[in-house]
Regions:
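Ligand-binding beta-strand-loop-alpha-helix segment within the catalytic cores
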Residues: 34-110
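Short glycine-rich or small-residue beta-strand-to-loop segments that form or flank ligand, phosphate
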Residues: 10-14, 41
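Active-site microenvironments of hydrolase-like enzyme catalytic domains
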Residues: 107-111, 116-123
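Short glycine-/acidic-enriched loop or helix-start segments at secondary-structure transitions
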Residues: 22-24, 50-52, 120-122
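Glycine-rich beta-strand-to-loop/alpha-helix junction loops that act as flexible
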Residues: 13-18, 111-115
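Glycine-rich loop at the start of a catalytic domain that most often binds anionic cofactors/ligands
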Residues: 18-33
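N-terminal glycine-/serine-/threonine-rich phosphate-binding loop
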Residues: 1-11, 29
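Class I SAM-dependent methyltransferase SAM-binding "motif I" and its flanking Rossmann-like core
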Residues: 120-133
């Protein structure tokens, strides 16, 4: 509804599970749904031993996965601008929070708990998050 009305729609999305993305891409393309007012905030990304995002071409890279399996498969005239695809950035740890707040919050949040019960790599019993739980 928001998108059809030309309003901004903000999603928080995981990379796992990934089964929804082929259906999403197919529907966007078949129904010609413009994502020009849509923002995707990915919850997490792997870092290497130097606390840098792993290589984009790695099969483990969430940025790479989203690019290859989602954004590249959506028709160019429908896909959102690259600046509307937000990932955690170790150089700017508040980027997600500040950008999300600047947009007025999220409209939709999908999550996929990891095998330990974590969400966005935050373990359920992490002491540093106890006050926020």
């Amino acid at each position: 509804e928001r998108n059809a009305a030309g309003k901004r729609t903000v999603f928080i999305v995981p990379v796992g599970p990934v089964g929804q993305y082929p259906y999403f891409v197919q529907r966007v393309n078949e129904e010609r749904i413009s994502l020009k007012n849509v923002w995707f905030f990915n919850m997490d990304e792997y870092l290497d031993e130097h606390d840098r995002p792993i290589d984009f071409d790695s099969h483990l890279s969430f940025r790479g996965f989203m690019h290859r399996e989602v954004y590249q498969k959506i028709r160019k005239e429908l896909v959102m601008d690259a600046k509307q695809r937000i990932f955690p950035d170790p150089d700017h740890p508040r980027l997600l929070t500040e950008t999300l707040e600047g947009l007025g919050g999220a409209d939709v949040c999908y999550c996929g708990p990891g095998w330990t019960g974590h969400l966005a790599f935050i373990e359920p019993d992490a002491p540093e998050f106890a006050e926020q739980a």
